[in-house]
């Protein structure tokens, strides 16, 4: 707690007036992270159609990760990395609510005939894993692109995956909406998509 207090620029006694232990501080950090994450995701409800709401949810996911990369890492860290045997129940409930929100976006796209019928939970897991993998690669410096270049990769790749899960009526349009295989590099030039991955350490 003393080290944490120094990093925050306050005294240890001042910190103890608000938190009993560093475990309680961590709990509060994760709780706040979930609330910020939720605010980003729930802007999707402003969408006018199931597809708009689904895509806005994806944008909210990306927006949170780019705005709060450290909190993003904390939210998806293994419990033992945070010093927990299990996730506290209130935090688990927050995580489940966000997972259900994502499932609901997929379910309403299925009901609207945009995505092929199937298990909303399984399809949501596929789409989430794709989004999370791309974001994690970028945040860890494994993609040779700037932020705007990554936004393009994220959106185009998302559309390609979505097209493969869509009904025949919507799949072709989603495929056409995805951009070409070139994106902006950090130096402002272009690099073929098959050379985006940074293999060096």
Set out the residue ranges of the language-model regions:
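Helix-turn-helix
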Residues: 1-24, 28
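Alpha-helical structural segments
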Residues: 7, 24-44, 52, 56-63, ...
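Conserved hydrophobic/aromatic "anchor" residues
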Residues: 19, 64, 71-72
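Solvent-exposed, amphipathic alpha-helical segments
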Residues: 36-47, 130-137
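Hydrophobic, amphipathic alpha-helical faces that serve as interaction scaffolds
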Residues: 71, 80-81
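Hydrophobic/aromatic-rich alpha-helical bundle segments in the mid-to-C-terminal region
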Residues: 84-92, 110-157, 168-182, 190-196, ...
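C-terminal alpha-helix
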Residues: 105, 160-168
